[in-house]
């Protein structure tokens, strides 16, 4: 099964930094970026980009250099990002909440010329800056910015003759299955995605968009930041997410678009439940969208009841800049489909024989279009393993297509084969998440005696209690025998990556250890100590 969504996006600028130019000419005094410490109009944003570009040049940044920007959502982060791109250097976008080990691995791999840290807005960025011995400088409108030492050994990458095909951002994947890979996204990749997002959601200059998804990740970069700037809208920056603050900001500033993850929406649900709030309705809010992780029906239904509006669903990967499919505002859905393919993107589903599967059957999802990455940095073999000679990118995700709408079934690597039958973790998770005591769950496979078992990890609500036995009985009412968990482990909080995704590789290790030590949940509590179950921005 193969399908192609047409795209008529018109001319795009050459560089991501050029998106502000039309609005400086049309509406220079329109608010562009707003944060707690102040705001920039489009005129001020353009000036900040120009001044930062000059500053970076003085600090030895050259075209083709990799420039690490360690930070969180802020005017400083945006200015550094767009100024670096305008110099034809590569912005290496790094979430400040990464560990020291993760950050240092990226620094070594990319061979950064310099590292900059948004120290005013981010405690974690300030800690990294101190650890690296960075100098601190005050920048107007940006607060304090850490400046790492110049790497004299850094060698610039050659520039592509076509500006639009040059690397506009280097984003390292969260690495839930191993070492992170550097995804090279071009100006075309990001601008195609941003412009298409504007068109699909009909974003206009009067929109006020809540930027809580980290701009160091693909969704926050293209779908939130660049799409907002292309549309001439106003972006309200938040470096972290707190349900109480979010409620105040959504109401006070009359925000119109909210992009979140299932974890963020679950926090809002828990906030409402703890305060016995049955309705969170904001008159100005017109679109709410979930992406970044699978959305289960229980969460979708609860959020829609709370907000009094449809929760849209999207799906993508960093390598695809990132959106592959999304539900449309004009065609709301009551299920958990991720909707049709993004405009201008081709999709096809292949079976194990690498041939297209019939409509309605599960296949491995392949994607082709202007959103597909240039490749993995310094990893040509890994790039060739996922992008074929015809430009098809293998997502390694399993999906089915019904009436032009995609449903993600699970990841190829996560597929559990039990008694010869396929078990898709997402299906089991959806059932468990329907229990009133469950905040979220994660299902992994465990090899035992030549077969695989289904192991479920469950995070419970602070208000409602349950037991593994009760949850097993609940799941048994909706799942056939081979899909039922062999073991259910209750955890204080799910381990997550810096992108807020559940770290299933870590859970799989716990599942294997659990059977070796013959425990019944205590091991999970010991290995996975309580942590804040929040999306790390």
Residue positions per predicted region:
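Conserved AMP-binding A3 loop
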Residues: 41-43, 168-195
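AMP-binding/adenylate-forming catalytic core of the ANL superfamily
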Residues: 98, 117, 369, 374-375, ...
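Conserved AMP-binding/adenylate-forming
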Residues: 12, 38, 53-101, 422, ...
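AMP-binding/adenylate-forming catalytic domain of the ANL superfamily
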Residues: 480-502, 521-536
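Conserved ATP/PPi-binding loop(s) of AMP-dependent carboxylate-activating enzymes
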Residues: 340-344, 353-386, 423, 466
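Gly/Ser/Thr-rich phosphate-binding loop
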Residues: 252-260, 270-333, 346
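Conserved pre-ATP/AMP-binding loop-to-beta segment of ANL
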Residues: 13-14, 28-29, 154-172, 179, ...
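Conserved AMP-binding/adenylation subdomain of ANL enzymes
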Residues: 191-208, 216-257, 267, 271-275
């Amino acid at each position: 099964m193969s399908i192609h969504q047409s795209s008529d996006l018109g001319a795009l600028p050459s560089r991501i930094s050029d998106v502000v130019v039309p609005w400086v000419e049309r509406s220079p005094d329109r608010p562009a970026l707003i944060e707690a410490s102040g705001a920039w109009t489009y005129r001020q944003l353009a000036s900040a980009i120009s001044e930062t570009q000059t500053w970076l040049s003085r600090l030895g940044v050259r075209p083709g250099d990799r420039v690490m920007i360690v930070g969180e959502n802020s005017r400083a982060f945006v200015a550094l990002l767009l100024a670096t791109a305008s110099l034809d250097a590569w912005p290496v976008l790094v979430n400040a909440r990464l560990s020291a080990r993760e950050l240092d691995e990226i620094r070594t791999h990319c061979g950064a010329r310099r590292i900059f840290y948004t120290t005013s807005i981010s405690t974690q960025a300030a800690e990294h800056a101190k650890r690296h011995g960075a100098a601190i400088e005050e920048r107007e409108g940006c607060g304090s910015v850490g400046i790492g030492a110049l790497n004299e050994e850094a060698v610039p990458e050659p520039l592509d003759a076509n500006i639009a095909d040059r690397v506009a951002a280097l984003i390292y994947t969260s690495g839930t299955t191993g070492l992170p890979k550097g995804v090279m996204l071009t100006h075309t990749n990001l601008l195609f995605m941003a412009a298409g997002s504007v068109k699909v959601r009909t974003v206009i200059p009067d929109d006020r968009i809540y930027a809580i998804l980290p701009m160091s990740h693909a969704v926050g970069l293209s779908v939130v930041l660049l799409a907002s700037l292309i549309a001439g809208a106003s972006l309200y920056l938040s470096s972290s997410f707190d349900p109480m603050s979010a409620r105040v900001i959504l109401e006070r500033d009359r925000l119109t678009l909210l992009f979140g993850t299932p974890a963020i929406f679950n926090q809002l649900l828990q906030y409402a439940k703890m305060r016995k709030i049955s309705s969170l309705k904001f008159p100005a809010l017109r679109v709410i969208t979930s992406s970044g992780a699978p959305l289960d029906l229980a969460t979708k239904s609860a959020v829609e009841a709370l907000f009094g509006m449809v929760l849209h669903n999207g799906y993508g990967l960093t390598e695809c800049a990132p959106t592959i499919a999304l539900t449309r505002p004009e065609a709301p859905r009551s299920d958990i489909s991720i909707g049709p393919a993004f405009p201008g993107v081709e999709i096809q589903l292949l079976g194990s024989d690498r041939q297209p599967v019939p409509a309605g059957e599960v296949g491995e999802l392949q994607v082709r279009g202007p959103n597909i990455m240039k490749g993995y940095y310094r990893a040509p073999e890994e790039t060739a393993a996922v992008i074929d000679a015809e430009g098809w990118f293998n997502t390694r995700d399993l999906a089915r297509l019904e009436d032009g709408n995609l449903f993600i079934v699970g990841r190829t690597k996560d597929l559990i084969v039990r008694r010869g039958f396929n078990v898709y973790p997402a299906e089991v998770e959806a059932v468990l998440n329907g229990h009133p005591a469950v905040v979220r769950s994660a299902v992994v496979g465990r090899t035992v005696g030549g077969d695989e078992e289904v192991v479920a990890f469950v995070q419970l609500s602070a208000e409602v209690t349950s037991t593994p036995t009760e949850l097993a009985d609940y799941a048994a009412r909706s799942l056939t025998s081979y899909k039922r968990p062999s073991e259910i482990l209750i955890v204080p909080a799910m381990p997550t990556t810096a992108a807020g995704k559940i770290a299933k590789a870590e859970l799989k290790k716990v599942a294997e250890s659990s059977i070796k030590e013959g425990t019944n949940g205590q091991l999970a509590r010991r290995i996975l100590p309580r942590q804040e179950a929040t999306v790390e921005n």
